[in-house]
Amino acid sequence: MPRYRKLQKGEIMIMLYKILTALVCLAVMVLAPIFVKEQRGGPCWRSLFVKMVAATGYMAAGGLCVAMTGVCSPFDKWMLLGLFGSWIGDLFLHLWQTKVFPAIGFLGFLSAHFFFIAAYWTGIRAMAPDRAFFTWPEIAFVALFDVFFVIFAVKTGLNLKGVIAVPIVIYATVITTMLCKAAVLGITAVQTGAAHGAFVLICALAGALLFVASDFTISILMFNEKQKKNYPLKMFNIVTYFAAELLLAFLIALI
């Protein structure tokens, strides 16, 4: 007869946290398409409720990942701030009562990207203390990405004339920097033999790439009049966005 070891209280709690995290993630991804359906006729209180429940879900996933490890490291704190910045962005970007709200939402997402960059850099320095913040290949990549974004904006007919063009280009630069740091974090984790290195690479890079895909599509939805009611594009945008947030939340349990 096989003998089974009795699980300790700590092990049971970790298992419970993992189950709860899986259920939360499932709920978020189920709510994502429901949100798109609810706001098909335009933003409303019901669509806002669904969106914010889903957004609270990725915040909860981050908190559960902290509970799994039992430690809230500097990396974890930056990541939680990033998730909270995204939550603020989700809230205000969807409010429609005044034009000030979308601007606050934009700043919320911009701050979230800065927090994620700070988290990645904290993780990188913990594994490779001598690494420079930027290397020349990274600078070249960011510059080329900005050029690509300008070409993309022209080709897709984005209305970025006037003052709005400056913050959008800044945002593109920041999210490209986040993508760079995510890649470096994952590669450094693998190179240094860090625990869960391969999973860190997958979650960090996939999360950042999905974030970029989501931001590209939302720029089309917001600044191209012909695409504002493109339902499949809206679905792609919101699914990639929430998937990105969840993948980034998972990093808290891995680093």
State what each model feature region is.
Residues 1-14:
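Short, Lys/Arg-enriched N-terminal segments with co-localized hydrophobic residues
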Residues 14-255:
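Polytopic alpha-helical membrane-helix bundles and their juxtamembrane interface segments
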